[in-house]
A protein has these predicted regions:
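Bacterial Sec-dependent N-terminal signal peptides
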Residues: 1-15, 19, 401-408
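Membrane/wall-proximal cationic-aromatic binding patches
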Residues: 12-67, 121, 127-138, 143
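Glycine-rich phosphate-binding "P-loop"
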Residues: 36-40, 175, 183-184
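Extracytoplasmic/secreted envelope proteins and their assembly/folding machinery
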Residues: 48, 52, 79-83, 288-295, ...
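A generic secondary-structure signal
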Residues: 54, 85, 256-258, 297-298, ...
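Conserved, compact domain cores that house catalytic/ligand-binding motifs in diverse enzymes
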Residues: 61-69, 74, 78, 231-323, ...
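Conserved SGNH/GDSL esterase-like catalytic core that processes O-acyl groups on lipids
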Residues: 74-181, 189-289, 377-378
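Catalytic His-Asp segment of secreted/periplasmic serine-dependent ester chemistry enzymes
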Residues: 251-253, 314-408
Length: 408
């Protein structure tokens, strides 16, 4: 039985001490530590090769990153500032993939988004009609009177859209009616097919776009992407309460269709908060088995992408009036490192990058606060810190690779 699987000795040692010796696990980069960068661990020796190769040709073709996670990255937390930093280096105008409807749209700062009259289905929905789920784990069915409007975020580099891409499946006679800025409404028929399709709208200066869909009986929407012909893009695929295991429900058949349009070169996985328990005695062998299989299956669906697994963040609990790290956090961190090791993918220890033991208490108590009072979730200020740390770690590895391989 999966629950009877035993973790490796590394995981057992982590239950005794929340700071597993890095030298026991992987040859660590002391130069990065000295530079104030918490480095990425490479468990295959070439775990970011596809990503590096794509960056080498970024002047010819855009590079796209998928960032899957739970409520820790809701509202574009972390991914927003990862995107900003990497786009400053590699170019790119746009926030990437955005949902049709979102319960955290008012919280997100990287895009302004309003909507009405949509039915939403997710990997975690109790009942899903006979429709495919999108690459983000969400699908959207327009209801009577549906509308959705997008405006750029309030940052100088995000003051307009250039390209809008709508991903959908239309088995009927649906049409799109859209308005750019304050112009006249334009109507377009949506391609009829059982496959995933993309409709492209381009303009030099889109300051707002409003859409509504008609004749929608056999129409499913998956998302809207805001990007350009070149540059780097980061897509936030957050889902509240997701442990990561529900990714197994994503259909390889449809994932390959989405990837034909999006062509990911790096897929980041951030999970664990919905799995770690307050006890430190759980082995989590079942979780290792499930997640390694999921990563193996995702590799098959995204053959030209690399994978980067983030460890769980710190999480605080109240013990006798003092906020301390929850006992299960260091165990989950070691479990995730073992998942990365068995999967031969890259790993970034977000727990240590945050500051390690009791760091969430410090984030919440900072002036101004960097995290919420639940001692679990970062706010935008805290997300900016971690997003930049992750970007610095990636840029450090990219620079090291380029220096080693002697290309500009």
């Amino acid at each position: 039985m999966l629950s009877d699987l035993r973790p490796s000795p590394l995981i057992d040692s982590a239950t005794k001490n929340d700071s597993t010796s890095l030298k026991e696990i992987v040859q660590f980069d002391s130069a990065a530590i000295k530079a104030g960068i918490y480095p990425i661990e490479d468990f295959s020796g070439n775990s970011l090769e596809h990503f590096y190769a794509a960056l080498k040709k970024i002047n010819q073709k855009p590079v796209r990153i998928a960032f899957y996670g739970d409520s820790f990255i809701e509202g574009d937390i972390i991914s927003d500032f990862l995107r900003d930093t990497l786009q400053h280096v590699y170019g790119g105008e746009g926030v990437g993939f955005v949902p049709l409807a979102s319960e955290v749209s008012n919280f997100r700062k990287s895009i302004q988004h309003t909507f009405s009259n949509w039915s939403t289905y997710t990997l975690l929905s109790a009942e899903i009609p006979d429709i495919p789920l999108g690459i983000s784990g969400y699908s959207y069915v327009p209801e009577e009177g549906n509308t959705v409007t997008y405006k750029p975020g309030k940052k100088p580099v995000q003051n307009k859209f250039k390209t809008v891409k709508i991903l959908y499946q239309n088995k009927g006679t649906a049409t799109l009616n859209y308005t750019i800025n304050v112009g006249s409404e334009i109507t377009k028929s949506l391609k009829r097919s059982d496959s995933v399709n993309q409709l492209l709208i381009s303009s030099q200066a889109i300051h707002s776009i409003s859409m509504r869909f008609s004749s929608t009986d056999d129409l499913t929407l998956f998302g809207v992407s805001f990007d350009d012909t070149l540059g780097l893009y980061v897509d936030n695929f957050s889902m509240r309460s997701n442990s990561g295991i529900s990714l197994a429900k994503l259909s390889p058949y449809y994932l390959k269709q989405f990837n034909a349009y999006l062509d990911y070169k790096l897929i980041i996985l951030q999970y664990g908060l919905n799995v770690a328990l307050e006890t430190d005695s759980t082995t989590y062998g079942w979780y290792i088995a499930k997640m390694t299989k999921i990563i193996r299956d995702l590799k098959a669906s995204f053959p030209n992408a690399n994978f980067l697994l983030l460890s769980v963040s710190d999480r605080g609990i109240n013990e006798n009036g003092k906020i301390i790290t929850m006992n299960g956090i260091p165990v989950m961190r070691a479990v995730q490192r073992e998942i990365a090791r068995q999967s031969g993918i890259a790993f970034w220890d977000m727990y240590e990058a945050m500051g390690g033991k009791n760091s969430m208490s410090n984030y919440t108590g900072a002036k101004p606060p960097l995290a919420a009072k639940d001692y679990t979730h970062l706010n935008h200020k805290g997300g900016k810190i971690i997003g930049k740390k992750l970007a610095e770690a990636l840029l450090y590895e990219i620079n090291k690779h380029e220096t080693k391989n002697n290309f500009p």
